[in-house]
UniProtKB/Swiss-Prot annotation:
Organism encoding this protein: Drosophila melanogaster (Fruit fly)
Disulphide bridges: C36-C39
Protein name stated in the entry: Bomanin Short 2
Residues bearing PTM Glycine amide: G43
Endpoints of the signal sequence: 1-20
Family: Belongs to the bomanin family.
Localization of this protein: Secreted
UniProt note on tissues of expression: Hemolymph (at protein level).
GO cellular component terms attached to this protein's record: extracellular region
C-alpha cells in the first residue's frame, strides 16, 4: 500500500509540473496572467 501512495504522489507531481510549464511552440514567449514585467521565466531545462 505504501508503494501505491508513493506512485500516486509521483503521478500528481508530474501532472502539477506539466500544468505549471505550458507546452507552447515558443518556450521563451511565456506570459502568465497578462503582461509580465519582472518575470524570470526560462524556457527549457
Amino acid at each position: 500500500m505504501k508503494f501505491f501512495s508513493v506512485v500516486t504522489v509521483f503521478v500528481f507531481g508530474l501532472l502539477a509540473l506539466a500544468n505549471a510549464v505550458p507546452l507552447s511552440p515558443d518556450p521563451g514567449n511565456v506570459v502568465i496572467n497578462g503582461d509580465c514585467k519582472y518575470c524570470n521565466v526560462h524556457g527549457g531545462k
